[in-house]
Amino acid sequence: MSSVPQAPPQASQEVQLIFQDIVSTVDNKNMPFIILDKKQAKIYSFQKDGQLLGEAPALLGIAIGDYYYPGTGQKQMSEIKVEERTTPAGRFHALLGYNSHGEEVLWVDFDMAIAIHIVVKGTVKDRRLERLQSPNPKDHRISFGCVNVPAPFYNNTISPYFIGKGGMVYVLPDTKKLTDVFGESLCKTSR
């Protein structure tokens, strides 16, 4: 008899709750899935049956917020205002693809230009690799909205599992309630 998958015990209560709802309702449609906890700047990757593949720190959009600003994905990066640089909360069907530099990314939402990818070098001032290691989630706010993760995490827990039909990505909110983002049906245990 196989054991019932559990969220990592060190994960936040919100991750624990949404994980249980995803697994119990098969909301992931039998595809691998990711839960991104923006408040803790942590990302978790799971097999389609809910078995943990890995967890890692993540860099996020510099602005706290749960909304996507319409049209941001079509702007040049230099035109995106700081307050528009959010990592939008929600449930997304994500697919592997390539960015404009020919590098593989997991497109969370192509039209929004939001992806999960290996941490980019950025400028010296950005200190992205240093920020990734910081225990303070506020230090992880640096990107234009994309989710930057360590290369081993991406290469071992995302790239090989999201081939083909992709998978689901659940981005937990910064300020909204889980039910406001994911609805009552998915958040049965979250009330």
Predicted regions and their residues:
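Residue-level detector of alpha-helix boundaries and kinks
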Residues: S3, A7, N28, K138-I142
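Gly/Pro-biased beta-strand-loop elements
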Residues: E14-P32, L36-R127
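Soluble non-cytosolic domains of exported or imported proteins
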Residues: P9-Q13, N30-F33, D37, F144-N148, ...
